[in-house]
Structures are given as structure tokens and as C-alpha cells.
Amino acid sequence: MRVAVISDTHLDEPTPWFRRVFDEHLAKADAIIHCGDISGDGMVRFLEASHPNVHMVCGNMCTGSARRHLAPRIAVTFEGFRVGASHGTCSQGSSAEYVLREFGPDFEVICYGHTHVFDWRKIDGRWVLNPGALQEGEGSFAYLDLVPGEEPKAVQVRV
């Protein structure tokens, strides 16, 4: 299973650039996880209408109904892998270590955003993934490949 993990789009509505990235890359994924800072209602509506398997969390910069209706963290299971996602906003210390504490030991992969910096590493037996910021000019996201019986794999995609 291939999951497109995105974060920190900071858009109220999808721009032509974002629509192109969506059509060329994200739409082909089996699922999409958005790790927060979507930012507005138009982006939430676009993602929900454009993909049948999208999961989103609220970030510190979300506005409107996105702030009111998106959870601060989610847990999903893909191909037997427990995957958690949150924005990763923390007042001190590392966002990766914060989300590890936030979710506890029962997750194989934890996705987060906030820092705008790609991160893929194993800490204490669990994988953490930050896809970077999917913004025009500094765009990146990650494909997370989950195959039963294999270690999770992630690759950064610059757009």
C-alpha cells in the first residue's frame, strides 16, 4: 500500500500549483495523510472530494471549520500497520520525540509536520516520518510504502 503523506500546505483554497501536484502525484496513492496546517476550509473540502481515502489532522495554523472539526491526532491501520498522525506542535524539544510520547508504543509509524523539514528515521523501534512542507517553491511530500511482513519504507518527493 502506498500512502502519500503531506503537511504544511498553508492554503485556504487549492492553487493551480497544488492541483497539478495532486493530479500528478497524490491522486495515485492508495491513501493520503495530511499532518496539519492545511490551513482553511477550501483545502479540506477539496481533499475530501478528490480522494476516497484521506485522513487529516489540525495544525496550529488551521482556520475556520478546519480548526473546529479536525482532530489534533488520528490513528489508522493500513495493511496491519498502526499509523498515527499529528501536527507535532511542541513548545520545547524535538517534534519527533514529542509525537513518540504522544502516541505511545503501539504504533509502527508516526507521521508529523510543523518543522517543514523531511525526517524519516527509526527511534526506539518505531518509525517517524515528517514529509516536509508541501508549498510552492519548497515543496516536498513523502510516499510511505507499507507491505505486510516488510519494514515500512518512505521516500521524499520534491515538487
Model-derived features: where do they sit?
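Pre-active-site segment of Zn-dependent metallo-hydrolases
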Residues: 14-24, 85-86, 90-104
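N-terminal active-site segment of His-dependent metallophosphoesterases
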Residues: 1-49, 53, 62-71
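P-loop/Walker A phosphate-binding loop and immediately adjacent motor/lid segment at beta-alpha junctions
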Residues: 3-4, 48-64, 77, 125-127, ...
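Binuclear metal-dependent phosphoesterase catalytic core
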Residues: 6, 78-79, 105-107, 122, ...
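Helix-adjacent hinge/juxtasegments
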Residues: 53-92
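Active-site environment of divalent metal-dependent phosphoester hydrolases
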Residues: 11-14, 39-42, 61-67, 90-95, ...
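Residue-level detector of beta-strand structural context in well-folded domains
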Residues: 73-74, 118-119, 142
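Active-site neighborhood of phospho(di)ester-bond hydrolases with catalytic His/Asp-centered motifs
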Residues: 5-7, 31-37, 55-60, 84-87, ...
